[in-house]
UniProtKB/Swiss-Prot annotation:
Record-given protein name: Ribosome maturation factor RimP
Homology family: Belongs to the RimP family.
InterPro entries documented for this protein: Ribosome_maturation_RimP, RimP_C, RimP_C_sf, RimP_N, RimP_N_sf
Pfam family, one: RimP_N
Entry GO CC: cytosol
Presence of the UniProt keyword Cytoplasm in the record: yes
Keyword line: Cytoplasm, Ribosome biogenesis
Taxon lineage: Bacteria, Pseudomonadati, Pseudomonadota, Gammaproteobacteria, Pseudomonadales
Compartment(s) of residence: Cytoplasm
Annotated organism of origin: Azotobacter vinelandii (strain DJ / ATCC BAA-1303)
Predominant place of localization: cytoplasm
BP GO terms, sorted: ribosomal small subunit assembly; translation
Physiological role: Required for maturation of 30S ribosomal subunits.
Length: 145
């Protein structure tokens, strides 16, 4: 899906931050996160949504019913790629794994960065190297300074 939709988003001048497909029974949700240095407004989401809808109608990559949602990643932005983990080093994060790692699935702490294919997070003075392929969901924890 990334290969199909990212070029459309980027051609409009936005960054395709990530794509989620959430299967919810008979009706699913396709969520596309877009970003821009100047921020994202509702008009930006509408513009991208119209273009993506056209591509999805032609290519028809999803056989079931779904809703398309285009939005900003927001303050609690999800992290999808190693590059994003590198860019967000120094932020507080919440990470959920697909399966336990060192006896746990949930980690909340300081994102240190990336080493090889591992995300480095400091939790209670212990540094964990979490394999990227084990990460189910990761989000920035917003700061309100």
């Amino acid at each position: 899906m990334q290969a199909l939709l990212a070029p459309v988003v980027e051609a409009l001048g936005y960054e395709c931050w990530g794509i989620e497909f959430l299967s919810q029974g008979r009706h699913s949700l396709l969520r596309v996160y877009i970003d821009h240095a100047d921020g994202i407004l509702i008009d930006d989401c509408e513009k991208v949504s119209r273009q993506i809808s056209g591509v999805l109608d032609v290519e028809d990559p999803i056989s079931s019913e779904y809703t398309l949602e285009v939005s900003s990643p927001g303050m609690d932005r999800p992290l999808f790629t190693l590059e994003q983990f590198v860019r967000c080093a120094g932020e507080q994060v919440k990470i959920r794994l697909r399966s336990p790692f060192e006896g746990r699935r949930n980690f909340q702490g300081l994102l240190r960065g990336v080493e090889d294919q591992d995300v480095v997070v400091l939790v209670d003075d212990h540094e964990y190297l979490l394999p990227i392929d084990l990460i189910d969901k990761a989000n920035i924890i917003p700061r309100f300074d």
